C-alpha cells in the first residue's frame, strides 16, 4: 500500500511511504519511506507545498506505482498553514480517486515522544504532555499515553491557553477525560521549546526532543486506527478564528 503523507501544522513535510502489507490494514504495520521533502519555515506553506509534492512524487521508486491513500495532519495549528496542507491532500485524493485520512498533529508529536521516552526510561505506561505553538503567546496542549506500539490515547481535551495556565487547563477536565492523567512524566512539542516554564508541569522535569510530528508517524497512527475500523475525518482543528480576517462591510451613511 502506497501512501502520501502531508503535515503543514508547523513547518511543511511531505513523504511517500510503502507498507509491507498489500491486503488489509493491520494494527502494527511496518512502513518504508520512499521519499521525503521538508522545510522548517512556519509561514511559507502555500509557496512550498507544490514544489515539495512534485519532488516527493517524482523521486526514484515512487512513480512506478499509483498512490493508494493520503494522510494529512488536521491540527490544531494556525489557520493558513493547516489549510494549505489539507487542501492539497484533498485535491490529490479527489483527482486520483483515493481516500484521504486525517490525524491530529498533537497525536503525532505524542507518538514520537512516547517512542523516545520508552527507549530512554523503559516506562511501561508514561503520560506525556504535548504543547505546540499556537502563536499569540499561547499553546495547544493535551495529555497522552500510548495505545499499542503505533497509536496514542488522548487523556484530555485539547486546550489553547497561555503556557502559565496549561496545568490549570488540564486539571479542569471531567473525571472520564482526566482518568489516569494525574502524573505527567515528560513534556514535548514546539511549545515546550519556546516556553521553558512548561517543563515544571512534568513531575520528572524532562523535555523530549520531538518538536513536531512527522509524516511517517502520521501514517503509523492512521494505519493502526484504520485497522480497528475507525473513520479518520479531515475536519481541521483550528480551535479559534484565523489571525487574518476579512474586514466587516462598511455601513452606509444616509
Where are these regions (language model features)?
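Surface "functional belts" at beta-alpha junctions
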Residues: 21-44, 99-213, 238, 243, ...
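DPxDG-like acidic metal-binding loop motif
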Residues: 71-102
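Glycine-rich phosphate-binding/hydrolytic loop that grips phosphoryl groups
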Residues: 209-238
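Phosphate-handling active-site elements
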Residues: 61-65, 93-103, 119-123, 229
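N-terminal beta-alpha supersecondary unit
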Residues: 1-76
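Stable alpha-helical structural segments in soluble proteins, enriched in small hydrophobic residues
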Residues: 56-60, 95, 113-116, 215-225
